[in-house]
Amino acid sequence: GDYIMPYLGASPDSVRNGKINYLINGDMMIDQRLEGAAYDAGDNNDDVYTLDQWIILSESNDGVDVSRDTTVPSSGAINSIKLDLEIANEMFGICQIIENKNCRDIIGQEVTLSFQAKVSNARIGDIRAYILAWDGTADSVTSDVVATWNDDANPTFATNWTAENTGADLGVGTSFAKFSVTGTIDTSSTANVAVFI
């Protein structure tokens, strides 16, 4: 099937500039559950953890096969996550929720989510990225952050989740390129932060 391949590891530039990467396993190196095998046939159902710390979210179960892959940007990366579309027109994404103790110092701050991505076929369109704030009880989050998928538009997020940036189609092409979204985590009573692509 057609696929998307994001890579969210820290770049040498971000390390040199003193920026902190709050995401765990952004370089997709760790896969304790299946040790590199594909997540499919139930392992890839909606709202299931796949590569360490990454949750697959999709309209239906078994709509997207997930695997660690060695196709990477030319930035010294070793792995990426491969999201292989199994159902035509399936809407899906990956999400990571940051624990309260690990995100306290970015609440109230402007933050940027940067990643590199490519698609196998230009017909996979409308890829968006979000920085989300959770204003419910700390670390008792709704991990399925999407309440309603909306065709070619921003999803409606689940109760207590707020997008801190405005989503827009990033125009991901068939070669790796860097994409960034920025937002201020200013939702009142934010207790957790997440990213969703």
Q: What positions do the PLM features span?
A:
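Short, Lys/Arg-enriched N-terminal segments with co-localized hydrophobic residues
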Residues: G1-I4
